[in-house]
Amino acid sequence: MGYPGKNTKGYEAPKRPFEKQRIEDETRIVIEYGLRNKREVWRAQSVLRRYRKAARELLAFMSQSSDEQQIATKKEHLLGHLNRIGLLGPDADIGDVLSLKIQQPLERRLQTMVYRQGLARSPKQARQMVTHGHIAIAGRRVDIPSYRVPRDQETLISYYGTSPLTSEGHPEIERINKKRR
């Protein structure tokens, strides 16, 4: 057993807690994506903040350094990572990292993907299905709604093998099949 390290928050709360416009925007996002609370919005904002900071540091490094190989390596590392997790396309540039919106990391959540693929009627139901263990990625049960689905796994989302939702007689499956016809 090692030293567990210092516990730190994965988000930063807003500086002004009672800013009307921000509260309305966050509430709209919470409803649209079926999030549990505003903390999940702040966590997504923190993720974006880290990527933007890395892009700004890379731009500063590009203006200071003349080592083209090191610049290319750092740029390829950042853009490759964002491409693998699905936030950017394969032909993206550093400017695209700076223009990322809050919706993009929220669209990569398992809960949102389950809803968008039609496996659930609403984002809230998608969250419930994930937490109850009815959803699998490549045959492995995933019960974390905030799991960030990598680009190569987004087509592998399905119902878990032993879930009652896999039987043809289940009302939810009948509803989905009727909707697809």
UniProtKB/Swiss-Prot annotation:
Residues 169-181 have a biased composition (Basic and acidic residues). Part of the 30S ribosomal subunit. Contacts protein S5. The interaction surface between S4 and S5 is involved in control of translational fidelity. Residues 108-177 form the S4 RNA-binding domain. Keywords: Ribonucleoprotein, Ribosomal protein, RNA-binding, rRNA-binding. Coiled coil: none annotated. Residues 161-181 are annotated as: Disordered. PROSITE patterns: RIBOSOMAL_S4, S4. It holds the Pfam family S4. One of the primary rRNA binding proteins, it binds directly to 16S rRNA where it nucleates assembly of the body of the 30S subunit. This is Small ribosomal subunit protein uS4.
